[in-house]
């Protein structure tokens, strides 16, 4: 019998029966016969026939296909070492950065990405010994480097809450604060604003979501916070007008009711 016993984004504890049948068990789960159970306290993530549980706490555990924000921490002969907040560093090989033929004997890879640069990449592969391979091919801005702005780090399991249903939450923050924001599924978020005040406001909203992610009425509270702060900035002459939302974001009263994905700016 093929059956799923939980809802997507449902909070579960170790030992919770998740599914039965020919499903693939991902991270945070184990299989016993035909049944799949949770091994951690976290949120259920169902994609196609794969079921995994994203831990509420702890380091980011990458999955193939995740879009992540990373920081270059070392430059080697034919690759870069990238910190993505996982237990192990990731690798970006030159062939996963460009199709252009590069003469490695005559080319210093620092001309593309240097130590300290922030990039936007996709998890391409993970080996059995936890080697993590990234690719920037096909990514917005060709993967970077992302200039200026700040990196905000939140709990990875709360990324869908920051994004909201259909991108409603993150789009509201970007619209009202007039900032560029890229959310990585590793919980690293790049925020770049027109000025320091708006950038700090966007970060304040993101950190509030991280702190209150499992509470009801969060969308309305974030909107109220943004509008209140923007009114203060207008009165101080920092901004001329408060941006208007084209559509009112739908409330997200369900504590676990999120299906957002971490996508580009």
Curated annotation (Swiss-Prot):
This is Exosome complex component Rrp4. The keyword Plastid does not apply. Residues 147-205 form the KH domain. PANTHER family: EXOSOME COMPLEX COMPONENT RRP4 (PTHR21321:SF4), PNAS-3 RELATED (PTHR21321). Residues 241-265 are annotated as: Disordered. NCBIfam families: PRK04163.1-1. The keyword Oxidoreductase does not apply. Residues 65-137 form the S1 motif domain. Non-catalytic component of the exosome, which is a complex involved in RNA degradation. Increases the RNA binding and the efficiency of RNA degradation. Confers strong poly(A) specificity to the exosome. It comes from Pyrococcus abyssi (strain GE5 / Orsay). GO terms for molecular function: poly(A) binding. Disulfide bonds: none annotated. InterPro entries: Exosome_RNA_bind1/RRP40/RRP4 (IPR026699), KH_dom (IPR004087), KH_dom_type_1 (IPR004088), KH_dom_type_1_sf (IPR036612), NA-bd_OB-fold (IPR012340), Rrp4 (IPR023474), RRP4_N (IPR054371), RRP4_S1 (IPR048565). Keywords: Cytoplasm, Exosome, RNA-binding. Component of the archaeal exosome complex. Forms a trimer of Rrp4 and/or Csl4 subunits. The trimer associates with a hexameric ring-like arrangement composed of 3 Rrp41-Rrp42 heterodimers. It holds the Pfam family KH_6. GO terms for biological process: CUT catabolic process; exonucleolytic trimming to generate mature 3'-end of 5.8S rRNA from tricistronic rRNA transcript (SSU-rRNA, 5.8S rRNA, LSU-rRNA); poly(A)-dependent snoRNA 3'-end processing; RNA catabolic process; U4 snRNA 3'-end processing.
